[in-house]
């Protein structure tokens, strides 16, 4: 397994949020600030990793015709367990994420990776696939959430105590004066526009890199012909 290609495919080239556009409902609804984005991203990554590992472990005994209902049972069990842990140990984050924790069960990313990778691959590959697909989605959520929080509220990492309980609620960065904030950014249309902007930036970077690669190949070919 080529590690570089493995990471590039999951974190950048086939990013589940910026390329495949899966699970957009929680991405747009819960990324009103950076902390919510991190919380939801970490939860989704944990669910992906655990479910991928479990499904891969039992892939040889899961009947092909019944695999989807079995996926859903495993995913819902894992999500319920994690929801109970969040309720017990990070109650503020649990309250903030609300209904979007149980809705992780229906997230297309998790079901898709279970069927595409976990059901057909080794436990180790499935485990790392879950981690890096989740991290790729979390990075996209964090980027959207950070931009929305800065533009909409002028702050960054407001409410960090939701994730790290021993941090005081007043610990955050103020980057923009309230009179310069754009309230649209914290609403779903603003999130949609910011997500589209990030997708456009990614596509521009990919296109620029592709053109440079082609240009370098052509220059090398010309140099070889001259020689």
Swiss-Prot record:
Keywords: Cell inner membrane, Cell membrane, Electron transport, Membrane, Translocase, Transmembrane, Transmembrane helix, Transport
Keyword Cytoplasm (UniProt): no
EC assignment: 7.-.-.-
GO cellular component: plasma membrane
Keyword Electron transport (UniProt): yes
Membrane topology per record: Multi-pass membrane protein
Name of the top EC class for this enzyme: translocase
Pfam families, sorted: Rnf-Nqr
Subcellular location: Cell inner membrane
Any one GO biological process: electron transport chain
Stretches that traverse the bilayer: 34-56, 68-88, 91-111, 127-147, 181-201
UniProt record similarity statement: Belongs to the NqrDE/RnfAE family.
Job of this protein: Part of a membrane-bound complex that couples electron transfer with translocation of ions across the membrane.
Subunit structure: The complex is composed of six subunits: RnfA, RnfB, RnfC, RnfD, RnfE and RnfG.
Name the UniProt record assigns to this protein: Ion-translocating oxidoreductase complex subunit E
Gene assigned in the entry: rnfE
């Amino acid at each position: 397994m080529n590690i570089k290609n493995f990471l590039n495919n999951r974190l950048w080239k086939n990013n589940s949020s910026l390329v495949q556009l899966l699970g957009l409902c929680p991405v747009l609804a819960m990324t009103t600030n950076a902390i919510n984005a991190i919380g939801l991203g970490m939860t989704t990554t944990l669910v992906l990793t655990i479910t991928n590992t479990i499904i891969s472990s039992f892939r040889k005994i899961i009947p092909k015709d019944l695999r989807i209902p079995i996926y859903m049972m495993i995913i819902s069990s894992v999500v319920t367990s994690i929801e109970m842990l969040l309720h017990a140990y990070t109650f503020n984050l649990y309250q903030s994420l609300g209904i979007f924790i149980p809705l992780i069960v229906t997230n297309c990313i998790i079901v898709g990776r279970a069927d595409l990778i976990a059901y057909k691959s080794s436990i180790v590959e499935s485990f790392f696939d879950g981690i890096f697909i989740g991290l790729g989605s979390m990075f996209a959520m964090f980027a959207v959430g950070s931009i929305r929080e800065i533009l909409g509220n002028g702050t960054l990492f407001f409410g960090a105590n939701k994730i790290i309980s021993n941090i005081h609620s007043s610990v955050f960065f103020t980057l923009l004066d309230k009179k310069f904030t754009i309230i649209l950014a914290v609403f779903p249309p603003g999130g949609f526009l910011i997500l589209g902007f990030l997708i456009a930036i990614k596509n521009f970077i990919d296109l620029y890199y592709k053109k440079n690669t082609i240009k370098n190949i052509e220059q090398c070919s010309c140099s070889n012909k001259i020689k």
